[in-house]
Amino acid sequence: MKKVCVIGWPVEHSRSPLIHNYWIGLHGIEGAVYERLAVPPDAAAETIRNLGGLGFIGANVTVPHKETAFAALARHDAIAKRLKAVNTIVTTPAGLEGRNTDGYGFIANLKDRAPGWDAKAGPAVLLGAGGAARAIAAALEDEGAPEIRIINRTPSRAEALARDLGLRNALVFADGEAKTALDGAALLVNTTTLGMKGESDVDLDISPLPAPALVTDIVYTPLETRLLRRAREAGYKTVDGLGMLLHQAVPGFEAWFGVRPQVTPELRALVLADMGMK
């Protein structure tokens, strides 16, 4: 039996089991199963270290345990070390290894949904300075973005993010300086939960963005956030956040089962149907 799980608190909302079990069935991997494992914060570190004893060959890690997983594991890939956060755990000959595929998922989604997109085209503007912003900023820099501009209500938090990641060309802006931040940018990314169902919307005038700019959002419920709708109506190219979820799952599945799965229209339709969307 090859068992893998997603660890979180809560974890009932996770669509990782739907994604991975779809791929397991598609590729005919016998004896494999992917399940949810709800783990409270005070038990997370011990559970993560004892994954093998619980019968798991690997795991995904979701909020609020990504930083706990990093601290609990002795081995990490280079990206997890830089981010100090783990979303994928793999069994290696040397033991459990923590990895982070969030940035990979973000970049792969843009390349998939916006063919021809190039990070080198110009500055990238990030709204927010939380955990998702860390992964996305690092990935964009690695992809060749010439400048990372971070807009955050608390500039000191954005400055700490840039310093901690060692970003080479980062600029920080307060909320009131958004017009300057957007001037000449090639990409705008909402890395916050603003715009998600039950949350307030992103309050931002995007008109200073040049016409060729791409606008994307990590939120995928709703699939088209108010930010994306406004951008689309203003003539900008847009990419929704669902693909980031789908693409970040690819490297882990390959590491666990030895097969590299594809993010297809069928998989996207399956997840959208589960979300009550079409």
From Swiss-Prot:
Q: Name one Pfam family in it.
A: Shikimate_DH
Does the keyword Kinase belong to this entry? no
Q: Where does shikimate bind?
A: S14, R15, S16, T62, N87, D102, Y220
Active-site residues, record numbering mapped to chain:
K66
Q: Which reaction does it catalyse?
A: shikimate + NADP(+) = 3-dehydroshikimate + NADPH + H(+)
- Alphabetical UniProt keywords: Amino-acid biosynthesis, Aromatic amino acid biosynthesis, NADP, Oxidoreductase
Is Ribosomal protein found in the keyword set? Answer: no
**Tell me, which GO biological process terms does this entry list?**
amino acid biosynthetic process; aromatic amino acid family biosynthetic process; chorismate biosynthetic process; shikimate metabolic process
Q: Name one GO cellular component term.
A: cytosol
Q: Name one GO molecular function term.
A: shikimate 3-dehydrogenase (NADP+) activity
> What metabolic or biological pathway is this protein involved in?
Metabolic intermediate biosynthesis; chorismate biosynthesis; chorismate from D-erythrose 4-phosphate and phosphoenolpyruvate: step 4/7
Q: Which residues bind NADP(+)?
A: G128, A129, G130, G131, A132, N152, R153, T154, P155, S156, R157, I218, G241
Biological function: Involved in the biosynthesis of the chorismate, which leads to the biosynthesis of aromatic amino acids. Catalyzes the reversible NADPH linked reduction of 3-dehydroshikimate (DHSA) to yield shikimate (SA).
Q: Which family does it belong to?
A: Belongs to the shikimate dehydrogenase family.
Q: What is this protein called?
A: Shikimate dehydrogenase (NADP(+))
**Organism for this UniProt entry:** Parvibaculum lavamentivorans (strain DS-1 / DSM 13023 / NCIMB 13966)
